[in-house]
Amino acid sequence: MPFTASDICKILFAIILPPLGVFLERGCGADLLINICLTILGWIPGIIHAFYIIFKY
């Protein structure tokens, strides 16, 4: 699957602020809430989850 410019922007946002990358990919839903909780518990789990969401969808 080739990356588009929006995918690259989402990946950069996911590194800086993981919930923003998830919000741009999936909107306001359960994935965003999960990512916010993971980011509060630790920045790295939030990034891993954001990458998973971005690469899956």
Curated annotation (Swiss-Prot):
UniProt KW Membrane keyword: yes
Keywords linked to the UniProt accession: Cell membrane, Membrane, Transmembrane, Transmembrane helix
CC annotations in GO: plasma membrane
Stored InterPro entries: PMP3 (IPR000612)
Protein topology in the membrane: Single-pass membrane protein
Subcellular location: Cell membrane
Transmembrane region(s): 34-54
Primary residence: membrane
Pfam family membership, one: Pmp3
Function: Plays a role in the regulation of membrane potential. Could mediate a proton leak.
Annotated family: Belongs to the UPF0057 (PMP3) family.
Protein name, as recorded: Plasma membrane proteolipid 3
Organism expressing this protein natively: Aspergillus fumigatus (strain ATCC MYA-4609 / CBS 101355 / FGSC A1100 / Af293) (Neosartorya fumigata)
Lineage: Eukaryota, Fungi, Dikarya, Ascomycota, Pezizomycotina
